[in-house]
Amino acid sequence: MVDAFAGTWKLVDSKNFDDYMKSIGVGFATRQVANMTKPTTIIEVNGDTIIIKTQSTFKSTEISFKLGVEFDETTADDRKVKSIVTLDGGKLVHLQKWNGQETTLVRELVDGKLILTLTHGSAVCTRTYEKEA
């Protein structure tokens, strides 16, 4: 099931990203740049290891993990978080915890597109990616 997520995905639509970034504490200047950026996400599956690379002119990140195993992550906005990713009903659910807070990043495939839903408290952002050929 995870194999379906593999590929190179380009951001084509983003809703409420600024509200989400404000909610997790991202500063004004960083939000301005991040809002203008159209990142590419590359998802690779290598046995039981999943690699997610996010590349943009703003910042590039890479995480490597196994489903259900907690790992340390430094986010694009430099938060140091404890993360765990699980597969739940065909969705990749990524939970990040830091300083008594938590946020979820849920990736799901809908009509051939990758939908990323970011949630922190009442802030909900939806980012839509299309697969590159």
Swiss-Prot record:
Q: Which residues carry this modification: Phosphothreonine?
A: 8, 30
Gene Ontology BP terms: long-chain fatty acid transport
What does the record give under GO molecular function? long-chain fatty acid binding
The entry's hexadecanoate-binding residues are 127-129
List ligand-binding residues for (9Z)-octadecenoate. Answer: 127-129
**InterPro entries hit by this protein:** Calycin, Fatty_acid-bd, ILBP, Lipocln_cytosolic_FA-bd_dom
Annotated residues for binding of octadecanoate: 127-129
Subcellular localization(s) per the UniProt record: Cytoplasm
- Keyword presence, Transport: yes
Origin: domain of life: Eukaryota
User: Transferase among the record's keywords?
Assistant: no
One term under GO cellular component: nucleus
**Which residues are annotated with the PTM Phosphoserine?**
23, 83
Q: Which UniProt keywords apply?
A: Acetylation, Cytoplasm, Lipid-binding, Phosphoprotein, Transport
Q: What broad class describes the main subcellular location of this protein?
A: cytoplasm
Tell me where in this chain the PTM N-acetylvaline is found.
2
> Where in the sequence is Phosphotyrosine found?
20
Report the domain remarks.
Forms a beta-barrel structure that accommodates the hydrophobic ligand in its interior.
Q: What protein family does this chain belong to?
A: Belongs to the calycin superfamily. Fatty-acid binding protein (FABP) family.
- Write the protein's name: Fatty acid-binding protein, heart
